[in-house]
Amino acid sequence: MARKSATKPVKARAKNARQAETRDDAKQHTRAALVNAALELFAEQGLDTPSLDAICDRAGFTRGAFYVHFKTREDILVAVMDQVGESFLAGVFAQMPDLAGGGRRLHHAVKRFVDSVASGAYPLMATGGKGPLVRPHQLLDACARSPVVRERYRDLVQLSVGAVAGLVKSDQDEGAVRGDVDPETVATMALALVIGAQTMNDLGLAMDPARLASGIERLLATSEKREKS
């Protein structure tokens, strides 16, 4: 009898754990649906137009469900920024340390970025008639209004600067990038170029990202690498 009764608490704990896991899964599903709905509406209508009711209707949930996960409209915008920004950066910088030697890490990252612009995958630039996921000027307007949104955008930019600086330093160590330039300065310059290119693109000014990238790479290359290219 003692053995039989001892199994009851174990079964109860297992059942409670399964129920908790199911509830957590449901919460994650709801949150993901709300974020994806906001992303779709921001892409279709801009950052300012979609209401919370519209986001909830698109996701198939109530305002009550929204407030379980987000306190304000700013919060869901930040969640969208996290999802889009972190996913994009992971695609550009993933597995760079695992590449073979030869000082090609920066080149590969630049190529991935240029390819993403050409394919329309970069969320802040229009390509070939396909509008950007988010208009850069709307994002900057949101940053001007909201310290929370501004801080998250700054974080993503600084994360990018750090990643690029790491690639520059690795390539310098392998003799592919000039050693007389500071990696963080180069990375900051690269991000300033990207943000400037976003503005030019938003204004409808023509430019060739691949040519810009090639020019920057030549400026950074050692004399030996330039002679070979």
What are these regions (language model features)?
Residues 79, 93-131, 183, 187-190, ...:
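Hydrophobic alpha-helical connector segments
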Residues 70, 77-84:
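Alpha-helical DNA-contacting segments of helix-turn-helix folds
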Residues 59-70:
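Short hydrophobic/aromatic patch on the recognition helix
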Residues 114-165:
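Short secondary-structure transition hinges
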Residues 1-45, 49-61, 75:
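Basic, helix-initiating cap at the start of DNA-binding domains
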Residues 27, 31, 35, 81, ...:
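Amphipathic, non-transmembrane alpha-helical scaffold segments
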Residues 44-47, 68, 178:
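Helix-turn-helix/winged-helix DNA-binding modules
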